[in-house]
From Swiss-Prot:
This is Succinate dehydrogenase assembly factor 2-B, mitochondrial. Interacts with the flavoprotein subunit within the SDH catalytic dimer. InterPro entries: SDH, SDH_sf, SDHAF2. Gene3D superfamilies: Flavinator of succinate dehydrogenase (1.10.150.250). The lineage of its organism: Eukaryota, Metazoa, Ecdysozoa, Arthropoda, Hexapoda. Its main location: mitochondrion. It comes from Drosophila pseudoobscura pseudoobscura (Fruit fly).
Length: 160
């Protein structure tokens, strides 16, 4: 009976904990996905050269109000919660007062970058901003992210 229980435990360990298949009973091997991650580590891989980056279509004849409405929508629907909160609150606060040139710069910022994590790391100043994106709008976004007014941003602002 004891032998049968031991065999069952070994088989279940082999099935449900595959990282311990070759580990001895005394070792405390931790699977890579359960290993602790320190706060100062950024997991960021360079894009391979063979990966084509999509080009964002230029819309030269788009009216300014239509562009602002599109950018407001795109600021809210980024695909990652961090940027959804940062960019939607930024757009709600500043986008309505942007000139045509500032709106074009903001459009290039949020749609010209192929990786949303880059925008997040630049805005939070974890990584340096490339020169082409280090504009007045990015500086304004960085100030917005610092949140000097200590505004609570648990949700996106209401659409008006």
């Amino acid at each position: 009976m004891l032998r049968q229980l031991k065999l069952t435990l070994n088989i279940s360990r082999w099935i449900f904990m595959p990282w311990q298949r070759h580990a001895s009973a005394s070792s405390s091997q931790v699977p890579p996905f359960l290993a602790p991650i320190s706060d100062d580590v950024i997991v960021d891989y360079e894009d391979p050269d063979y990966l084509p980056l999509p080009e964002y279509p230029v819309r030269p004849n788009e009216p300014l109000e239509t562009r602002k409405q599109r950018l407001l929508y795109q600021s809210r629907k980024r695909g990652m919660l961090e940027n959804d909160l940062l960019l939607s609150t930024f757009a709600a606060k500043y986008l309505k007062d942007f000139s045509a040139e500032q709106t074009a710069i903001y459009d290039q910022l949020i749609n010209g970058v192929s990786n949303d994590w880059d925008i997040y790391y630049w805005a939070t100043e974890v990584k340096p901003t490339p020169e082409e994106y280090n504009t007045e709008i990015m500086k304004l976004l960085k100030e917005h992210v610092k949140n000097a007014e200590r505004v609570t941003r648990f949700r996106q602002p209401d659409l008006t």
